[in-house]
Amino acid sequence: GDRSDVIGQGYHPTSALPQVTNPESGFLHSANQTPFNVTEAQDNPQPNTVPADGGWQTRMTNRATRGLELFADFEQISFDEAWQLKHDNSYSVNYRGMTFLSEVTALPRSDDTVSRAIEILENWDRGTDKDNRGAALGVCVLAAEWQAESGGTSNPDAQAILDNCIDQTLEIGGRFDPRWGDVNRHGRDDTHWPVAGGPDTLRAIYSRRLDGDDHLTAVAGDGLYYFIRWTPDGEQKLLGTHQYGNDMTNPESPHYL
C-alpha cells in the first residue's frame, strides 16, 4: 500500500506472545503450524490470551498433525523412539491433504489407466519408505495440494493433477507403482542413492526432476538437526546431523559426495 498511517508503530513484548513453559505433557512439537496446537490440549496457549493483531498462523501441517499423534502414542519416550519419531515418513490420515487425495480417488474411472492409478492410490498406506509402491503417485498428488496451500491458492483441478501424476510416474518409473526409492533419489550426477520421505513428512524430503533425469532428486528438506539427551548422572550427549551446506558440492571439500 501507500499509506503510512496504517503501518504499525510499536512492538508486542515477548511476554505477550504465545508461549509454553514446562508443559505437563513433557513435550513441545512445533512444525510450521498454529502456535495454539503444539503440545497436549491442556498445555496449549489460548488465542484469547494473546494480541488479536499478532497474525498468528492457523494452519496445521502434516508434520504437526503426525508428530502430535505419535507423541500421544508413545507416552514416555526413549532416545531410540525419539529418533524413530523424527524420521517417520508417513502422512497422517487426519492431514488436510487427505481431502484432496479423496477428491482424486473419487474421479470417474474413465479408462484402464485412470482406474489402475486410482486403485493404487486407494490402497496406498500413506507411507514414503524406499520400498513403498504407492508413494510415487501418492506423493505427486499430495505435493500439488501442498504447493497450493503453501502459496495461498485454491487446490488445483483434481483430474489434471491425476493425469499429470500418471504421466510423470510412468515416465520416470516405467510403471504405475515403482518402488519409491527407485525414483526418489539423493545425490548428484551419476552418484545417487534411494531416499525415503516426502513433502511435509517428519522425514522431510522435497524432490523434483532435474534436466530430464529419469528420476526425482531431493533438493530440500532435512538439514541441520540435533538430538540432545541427559544421562542419569547429568552428562549431556548430543548427536547432530549436518549436510555441510554447499560445501558438499565442492570437489575440493572432504565432504564432497
Indicate residue ranges for each PLM-predicted region.
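C-terminal/peripheral segments of proteins
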Residues: 1-96, 103, 107-110, 119, ...
